[in-house]
Amino acid sequence: KFSIKKKDDAAAKVGEDAQNAAAIKAHPLLSRLQLGGGLSTVGYASVRDTAAINKIIYSAVAKRLLPSDLRLLWSAQPADNVKMKNIYELHALKVTTTTGRAPLEGDVITDAKDEFDQMGSPVVSMKMNTEGARKWAQMTKANVGKAIAIVLDGVVYSAPRVNGEIDGGNSQISGNFTIEMTKDLANTLKSGRMPAPARIVQEEVVGPTLGAQSIQMGIISFVVAFVLLMVYMVMMYNIVPGMMANLALLVNVFFTLGILTSFQAALTLPGLAGMVLSLGTAVDANVLIYERIKEELRSGKGMKQAVAAGYGNAFSAIFDSNLTSLITGVILLTTGTGPIRGFATTWIIGIIVSFFTAVFLTRLVYDYKLNHDKWMHCKFDTAVSHNLMQGKKYKFMSMYKTTFTVAIVAAVVFIGSFFVRGLSKSIDFTGGRNYVVQFENPVEPEQIRTVLGDAFVNADGSKATTGAIAIGTDGKTIRVSTNYMIESNSPTVDDEAETILYNALKKANLVSQKSVEAFKNPDVRQGGSIISSTKVGPSVAKDITMGAIYSVLFALIAIFLYILIRFRNVAFSVGSTVALAFDALTVIGFYSLLWGLVPFSLEIDQTFIGAILTVVGYSINDKVVVFDRIRENLKLHPKGDRQQLFNASINETLARTINTSTSTLIVLLCIFILGGDSIRSFSFAMILGVVFGTLSSIFIASPMAYIVLGRKIKEEPAEEAAVAEVK
């Protein structure tokens, strides 16, 4: 009997589940939304069901069936009159204006604060200006006994009942509030003190497929760069030192990811680029230490003494170069926008972590092994790197007139190109809209430019500026840019621009979507669609332009002051700042000369400004290392011939310069080739910066410091001139 009853119960439960499933399928809204509530509240739902309900109430069918003046919005906070947690209210609001906007907006509120009423309950008091007070009196008089909703960002913060006409502009909002809720509501109301209603001045929409592809490309470039760096370190510094450097790289990655996870930071492509570049920074520290250890071993010291001296002598160069890069990273973080801040965050974390892993972590391992008489005969070179650039006596200082002449001619050419060809400015600096459109079949950008040439016409009858460039190598992805009606505040302009784009491409048989809604949907790829879009208003474009100029100037000034403080000589500050300015000019100049001639975009945007600042931060590394060696030799030989001393210092650091530049170029080439189109322009600027930044350290920064410092002093005795060149 028991078994029969158990089977009957199970069958009944299965039947009940089937009935529930059928009911949910037949009435999906009623199964998730509990009706009732009174006043503006039409129902309650769990937070986990809101997404499913939104698909129903915001669907095309709902738009046709529901009244046109009805708006359904969720509450900002969970309801407090239900027993379950995370239950939100659904409010039904009536649109009372022809424009669809609220009859009263936040600009009429002059003050709002959280207080307590006579019963000691938390309330919010607000005060309006004269015009707001007049309209508020009219609204409250016409809606006694009804609710008036306070809405921000599409959610209802409060919907209090109107008990009577309120004049004078002073009102009190009461309800079942907590102190935290009244503080939040007061701050929300005070945010309405802006001089004009808020409108979208900058927007970026990325389709999920495009975003996934970008992240995948970033991860691939990161993994490939990491593996190549590991191979390079072993190839240049042998098994044990190479693997120790690789261990430091691995710990660097884990620490960086751990810190990002603790901050709950989202993984973005610029953030991945920052991580990849931080690998180059980590390698630089290890290269400095290993080159110093090799010098100490060549001087006849034992392994223990050589390792201790190598770490000790390399510390100042590592500290100064990392700190100058950190200064640039902080400037990027404080002055940049979303993508640049993401890059700066991971780069800053990488700089700090690489300093810890290179200077302290690997030192602990070496000390432990050497104290136990292990690794006493460890080799820090291989057949490839043995005596690399050792004993060279290049006379760099005697070439400064020639190199300065070449630099001046190049600067004139770059500046001339600015006036003749200009720069390919993105909407970040001009204002406008970008649409990345994926077509079914390959299409030429020139064809798109022809099709859209007369499509976008501004309200005054003038033609909007329109452009198109290819994205990727398949020929199916085109980025369309236009400044159509960018000055307009109308909320319908965005839809108008997308409709114009769709109609023009549809007429030319370039897309086959049956509606503009399908064309705008990034998930509907068949027939062609917009997979991402960006909008920048003219005010934001002006702010970005000025912010870019200020950030670069501020970076140069900050580095000038830091070098002055650390090296206590204006000659090094002048040399480094002039060279850094030339590095920035060179990168910008090549972008002016090459845009339109290379098969990838060279637009000047916020990412490019981030690249310029990164070039400044990276380039100063090499200059600091060279200057640190010059400073060291000046202390050892204060009366030595300075031309010979400068030449010797540069020659002594050539091996480090070559290894660091090569390892960084490996990383950047991985980003450039594998990182995707969205980061290619950034990596190209960095490649130019590394190449010309390295050259400027030798041929501009050092000679400039040499000239300012003074060339002729009394030569020291021959026995003290060990570092001098033999003429």
Question: Can you say where each PLM-predicted feature lies in the sequence?
Answer:
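Pore- and gate-forming transmembrane helices of large, multi-pass membrane proteins
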Residues: T209-L229, T281, K301-T337, K395-M397, ...
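Cytosolic juxtamembrane regions of multi-pass inner-membrane proteins
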Residues: G280-S321, D367-W375, S592, V598-T660, ...
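Hydrophobic alpha-helical transmembrane segments of membrane transport and translocation systems
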Residues: G258-I259, E295-S316, D320-A407, N647, ...
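Juxtamembrane "pre-transmembrane" interface segments
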Residues: G169-Q172, E180-V227, I500, A504, ...
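Small-residue-enriched core segments of transmembrane alpha-helices in multipass membrane transport
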Residues: G242-Q264, M275-A282, F343-A358, S573-W595, ...
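Interfacial segments of transmembrane alpha-helices in multi-pass membrane proteins
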Residues: V124-S125, N129-V144, I148-A149, A212-L267, ...
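Non-transmembrane, solvent-exposed regions of membrane trafficking/translocation machinery
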Residues: K1-R161, K542, M546-G547, I563
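Transmembrane helices with small-residue packing motifs
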Residues: M389-N441
